[in-house]
Amino acid sequence: MNKKVGLWLDRNKAVIVSIANNVEGKRIITSDMEHYILYSTVVPGDGSPENIRDRRFWNHLGEYYDKIIAHIRDATEIQIFGPGVAKHELQKHLEREGLMERIDSVEDADKMTDLQIATRVQKRFPIRSRFDLSGMNASSPTGRE
């Protein structure tokens, strides 16, 4: 199966648009990072509060990227875009997983609606309409010679 994936992400949310067999699908993954930061606690005796909070932050972020990778692992081509550093952090996680060669592009993008994200992915990986007869031989009604 030839699955192509485009995804917009920041540290709070990832919108994954996948195209396989000319069918498009969408999945949203959230990190719950805002909730995590607001309500994380530090237990006395575990070390400095800043170090513990930082370690927990990076562990939580790593789990978020692992969830994303689980949904895009079988893609043959991956387009990554979004604001900030999250796209580069995900790229490093993909490198560690041995998926670097599947990355088609890593691009900057501002906040986008789900429709804008889907449109951008469709432009990068066009879906061939089932009514597109351009691949058929015009002299034969069945497309075969």
Task: Report residues per predicted region.
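Terminal alpha-helical anchor/extension segments at protein ends
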Residues: 1-145
